């Protein structure tokens, strides 16, 4: 949506209960109601009710008045059972490498996940602060 002010330097904002987030996306703000609806893989489409819920939550928590939604979309989020990403070689399927389960954090975690995957594939150094065993598929 168009916030009618300069937002390029704004941080990503998530409310404490994780019921919405918004972040700069060019001159606009990208927003989400942080909803999760279990479903089979499909060509998912946004629901107008979810757009209205996001608007209501953001307007209730901020001083912003959302007058116009520029575009709306929906996406499927994949989670592992423990809700952590899965990165590593599968011991039950030789040659198969997992890089999945980022849930709603794929864009934000992609640099760290890519570096972790690169290290696992090439035998390089894992980024500081990442324990590959906590992310590996063999933890299940």
Annotate each predicted stretch with a short phrase.
Residues 59-140:
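C-terminal catalytic lobe of FAD-dependent flavoproteins
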Residues 2-95:
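Active-site lid/adjacent beta-loop-alpha segment flanking the redox-cofactor pocket in flavoenzymes
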């Amino acid at each position: 949506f168009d916030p009618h002010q300069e937002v390029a330097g704004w941080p990503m904002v998530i409310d404490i209960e994780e019921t919405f987030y918004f972040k700069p996306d060019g001159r606009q703000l990208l927003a989400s109601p942080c909803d999760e609806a279990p479903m089979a893989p499909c060509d998912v489409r946004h629901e107008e009710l979810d757009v209205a819920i996001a608007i209501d939550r953001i307007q209730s928590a901020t001083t912003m008045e959302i007058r116009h939604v520029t575009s709306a979309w929906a996406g499927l989020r994949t989670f592992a059972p423990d809700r952590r990403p899965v990165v590593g070689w599968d011991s039950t399927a030789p040659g198969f490498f997992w890089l999945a389960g980022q849930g709603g954090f794929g864009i934000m975690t992609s640099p760290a996940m890519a570096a972790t995957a690169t290290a696992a594939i090439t035998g390089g150094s894992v980024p500081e602060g990442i324990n590959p065993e906590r992310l590996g598929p063999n933890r299940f």
